[in-house]
Amino acid sequence: MKDRDVNIKFKKDPVLLDKMLQELQQKLMDSLPWLNVAFGRAYKLARHDDGGNKFLYPAAYNGKSEYISLLPNDNFGNFSWFDIYDPQEITPISQALPQYTFNGALVFWYNLDSIYEDNDFVYTEEIKNEVLRLLTTPGIVSGASRLNITKVYERFENIYKGYSLEKIYNNWAYKGEGVAAYDKQFFMHPYAGLRIEFNITTRNLCQYYIK
């Protein structure tokens, strides 16, 4: 997968969750010069091996019924993606303008050597500080909306929480799907990642579909 194969497109008139995520995608790209690709929402896909084992992984939709794996890689530089949880909550504040709340995580995967020339230290705290400062900027989400940061994960298995990498590591089941190669190549310096969990509450997105 080369950079030219990544197809980031934005809907012309997004609503609900798409509207919020597209705005955040654009702000991430505008504000973080080291971020090469800001993907939108990830989808949970499955691969099955000959032994009947199922491997779950996050993937971004790339158009034309194609998906891109978001497992640790160096195919398209430093990247981010959104992991959105079920359920999404709707609170009937009023019939015409209910409150809409969703929870999720913003995940980053990056190569420190592409960001810092100095490799005598691990600069993950600097990256975390930069991202958190951006996400807590007043007005980071538009309209009558509020974004709250709730948790930050940095261990590799927790960055991929909810997918098979987490299960493999937590159960000490090191087998299949090239996990040993991930260990050797991507789970050590200069590679690192972040999983920032959040919730967003808004009232200005639901009015378009309430009759």
Specify the residue positions occupied by each region the protein language model found:
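Small/polar-rich, solvent-exposed N-terminal microdomains that initiate assembly or binding
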Residues: 1-94
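Hydrophobic side chains in beta-strands
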Residues: 84, 108, 196-200
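Short, charged interaction patches at domain edges and termini
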Residues: 1-38, 95-99, 149-211
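A broad, low-specificity signal for short, low-complexity segments enriched in glycine/proline
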Residues: 56-71, 143-161
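Short, flexible beta-strand-to-coil junctions
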Residues: 87, 111-113, 201-203
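Extracellular/virion structural assembly segments
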Residues: 93-101, 105-150
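A broad, low-specificity signal marking well-ordered, structured residues that form hydrophobic/aromatic
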Residues: 79-80, 104, 196
